[in-house]
């Protein structure tokens, strides 16, 4: 039923079972069965005609935790036939993580996902800075992605705070916020999504009830 609704609402970017290489997810630690489950899901969606209208995003965390070979993100990859886009959660490691300074920023954190597939488009499916990094440097690298990593076609800033992950809000750092406002003026970035997109999806949601 969910697959049929997704087909009717399309196009949407669908990111199921993300961050599978992180120990905080219930499906972490078993790459073999993860791949089997993903392929089964994709095959069902294909049979229902969903894959022709929607984008399936396979989206690990930028850093595998634990960082063992058995838990490497590549082990969870179901194959190019079963994935449309690559996604990645892109955050600085926590204060307790023993990563050097240059491993805490977008351009470096992107390197792992690039190795999984040679030509799939990439999106930062969620990301943002934290107290463990230089906020202005993070913002600068965020906007450099379009020039230095041309496969990156979309970015999503997770603008929130909580006790576990700290304050990731842009407005928490006035200097970083002003830099963001300046850099986002580049016409490359979408300003507004047309109202028709919202109204069309809302209509379809109402019709599916």
Task: Please provide the spans of the model-predicted regions.
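Glycoside hydrolase catalytic-domain groove-lining segments
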Residues: 85-133
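An active-site-proximal structural segment forming one wall of the substrate-binding cleft
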Residues: 1-13, 33-49, 72-78, 146-147
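Cell-envelope and extracellular/periplasmic
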Residues: 18-19, 27, 61, 79-81, ...
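Substrate-binding cleft of secreted/luminal carbohydrate-active enzymes
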Residues: 12-13, 120-209
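Alpha-helical scaffolding within the catalytic cores
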Residues: 1-2, 62-78, 100-114, 136-145
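Extracytoplasmic/secreted cell-surface and envelope-processing proteins
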Residues: 23-27, 65-68, 95-98, 131-135, ...
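Aromatic-lined carbohydrate-recognition surfaces of secreted/lumenal glycan-active proteins
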Residues: 38, 42-71, 119-132, 154-160
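Active-site groove signature of glycoside hydrolases
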Residues: 2-31, 53-62, 86
């Amino acid at each position: 039923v969910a697959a049929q609704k997704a087909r009717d609402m399309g196009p949407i970017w669908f990111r199921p079972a993300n961050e599978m290489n992180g120990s905080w997810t219930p499906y972490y630690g078993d790459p073999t069965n993860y791949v089997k489950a993903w392929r089964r899901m994709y095959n069902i969606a294909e049979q229902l005609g969903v894959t022709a209208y929607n984008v399936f995003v396979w989206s690990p965390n930028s850093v595998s935790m634990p960082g063992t070979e058995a838990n490497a993100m590549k082990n969870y990859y179901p194959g190019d036939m079963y994935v449309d886009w690559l996604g990645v959660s892109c955050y600085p490691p926590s204060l307790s993580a023993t990563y050097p300074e240059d491993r805490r920023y977008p351009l470096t954190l992107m390197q792992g996902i690039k190795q999984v597939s040679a030509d799939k488009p990439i999106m930062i499916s969620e990301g943002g800075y934290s107290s463990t990094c230089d906020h202005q440097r993070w913002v600068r690298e965020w906007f450099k992605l379009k020039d230095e990593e041309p496969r990156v076609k979309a970015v999503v800033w997770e603008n929130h705070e909580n006790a576990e992950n700290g304050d990731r809000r842009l407005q928490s750092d006035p200097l970083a916020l002003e830099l963001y406002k300046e850099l986002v003026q580049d016409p490359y970035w979408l300003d507004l999504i047309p109202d028709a997109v919202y109204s069309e999806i809302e209509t379809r949601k109402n019709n599916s009830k």
